[in-house]
Amino acid sequence: VDKQIGSGAYKLTLVSESITPWENDLVSHDATAKEYIVINSTPGGLKKAITAANKDYTKIKNLKITGEINAKDFYFMRDSMDILQALNLKDVRIIGTNEHVNDGWSDCINKDDQIPHFAFNGTGRQGKKSLNYLVLPDRLKSIGTRAFFGCEYLSGSLTIPEGVTEIQQGAFTACKSLTGSLSLPSTLVYIGNDDQSNHEDIDYSCGTFAGCGFVGELNIPEGVKEIRGYAFDNCKGFYGNLKLPNNLEKLGERSFFLCKNLTGSLSIPQKIKIIPNECFNGCGFDGTLTLPNGITSIGNSAFGDCHFKGELSLPKDLRIINNYVFYNNDFSGELKLPKNISVIGEKAFAYNWRLMGTLEFPEGIQSIGAGAFAHCRSLEGLIFPESLENIRWESSWSEDGGAFQGCYGINSIVCKGDLPAYVQTGAFEGVAKDNFTLEVPESAISQYQAAPGWCDFKRIAAHHELVCRPSVACALSTEHKQKLVINAEGEWEVASKPDWCEVSPASGNKKTEVTLTIKGMAKNADSRDGKVVFRLKDKDYTHECSVSQYGYEYGEDEWITLQKATKG
C-alpha cells in the first residue's frame, strides 16, 4: 500500500498470491476437514454397502453416507462400529420404519426424515463414546428421543438444520464436550416432545440439551411453542440476554435451571399461564423481571437465587406464591400483593432486603410460610387481614426460619382480625417489639395480649384509620413543596410539626390532599430532620410523616456548569 504524493490517495499493488485447497487448509475452517470413507447406502443396507466397498466397518473412523438409511443402519453404527469418530450425514435421506422401539422408558416410532430414537444411545442409556464429530442431514424434520444422549465426547459447535421442527427429550443430554455454539433453526417448534400424553416425569433425566457445554448466546427461534422440562438444565456456558419467543405457550420444570451466566432482564411471554418449579432457579439475571397478568401459578423456586432488580409487579390472577419463588433476589420498592393470593410459601421473598414501605396482605390470605420475608430489612409496616390464620416459623432454620425474621425496619403492624392469627414462636424474631404499638380491633385487644406470638409485643392498642401517603419527605437546601394524601376515618388535624415545615390545610375530614412545604435553608447549613404528626380529633391516635432536609452547596433543580470549552 503506497500513499500518493500530492493527492494523498492510496494505491494497492498485489505483489504475490498463494491459494491453498480448502481441504488442506485446516486453519480456515477450524480443522473440520475429514478424510471420509464415502458409502452410498439403501435403507437397512449400510453394513452390506460397506462390505461391498471392501471396507472393514470395525476399523472405520470417519464415515460419510449418501443415499438412504433407516433406524437399522443407525443401530448398526451404534453397536458395531466401535471406533467411529466422525459421521457426515449431510447428503443422506432417512427413511422411517414406522416400527415401535422401546427401551423400557419410552415407546417411540421412527419416522421419515428423523434421527431415530436412541440412535447412538444404547442399553442402560450409554452414549456412543467414540463419536466426536457430527454433521446432520440437510433434509431433516426431527431428532428423536435420546438420539445422542450421553455422547459425552461429541465436540465443537452444533448446527441444527433448517426444516427441523422438533428436538425431542434427551436428544443431546449430557453431551458435555459440545463446547462451541448452538444454532437452532427458524422452523423449530418444540424443544422436547410435543406429545401431550408423554408424561413429564421422564424430563428430569432427559432434558433436551441438559448438561451440554455450549458457550455463547442462546437464541431461541420465534416459532418455538414449547420448551420441555430440564431442556437447558445446567447449561452454564450460555451468556448474555435471554429472549423468550412471543409464541411460547409452555415451559417445563427446570427449563433453564442454573444457567448462571444468562444476564440482563427477562420478560415472560403473554401466552404462558404457569411457570413451573425451578424454571429459572440460579440464573444470573441482573435486570428486571416482567410477568404477564395471565400467569396463575408460579412453582417452587422458579426465580430463586437470581439477581433481579427493580420493582416486582405480580400478575393480578396469581393465587399461590410457592416456596422460595423469589428467594434471594434484589427486588426493590413497594410490593403489591394480588387480591386473590391465599398462601405465601416458605422463604418466598426472603433476603430481598430492598423491598420497602408498608406491605398489605389482601383479604383471603390464610397462611404466611416460614421465612417468607426473612431479612427483608427495609420493610417498614405490615397490615394483616381478617382472613389470616397463621404466621409460621421453622425452628431448624436458625437464621431465617421466621416469616419476618430479621425485618429490623418494621415499625408498624396493623391486624384487622378480631380473632388473632396463630403466630409461631420465632415468626417475628429480630423485630423490635417494644418500639411501636401493635394495632388491633378495639374489641380484640385482650385476645391479642394473651395470644402466642402477639403477647410478645409490649404495646397493643386499638387501630383507627389514619394514614399519610407518602410518609417520608426529603429536600435539599431550597424550598420544597410536596403533595400528601391523608386517609382518615373522620376528622383529623396536624398535632405537631417542625417550625421549618408548613402543612396546608392543617385539618380536614376523611380523605384529604394537603401540601407540605419545607422552607429553604442556607446552603451548606447543617442537615435537619423531624416529624409531622397527624392526629384524629377526639382520639389519642396519631400518624407520623418523617421529614428531612440536607444542607448542600447547590439548590434543588439547579443547573451546574463544571467546565466550559469552546474548542477541542
State where each predicted segment sits:
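Surface-exposed, short loops/turns at beta-strand junctions within beta-sandwich domains
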Residues: D2-G8, K510, M521-R528
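A short beta-strand micro-motif common to beta-rich folds, especially ectodomain repeats
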Residues: G8-L12, D526-D538
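Beta-strand-rich extracellular modules
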Residues: T13-I19, K519-M521, R535-K539
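Edge beta-strands of extracellular beta-sandwich domains
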Residues: T20-A33, Y541-Y550
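Structural signature of tandem-repeat unit edges
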Residues: E35-S41, K61-I69, L84-E99, D103-D113, ...
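Consensus positions within tandem repeat domains that build extended binding/scaffold surfaces
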Residues: F118, G144-F149, Q168-T173, C206-T208, ...
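Surface-exposed binding patches on compact interaction domains or structured appendages
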Residues: L466, N487-T515, W559
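Short, solvent-exposed loop/turn segments enriched in Ser/Thr/Gly
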Residues: S477-L484, M521-V532
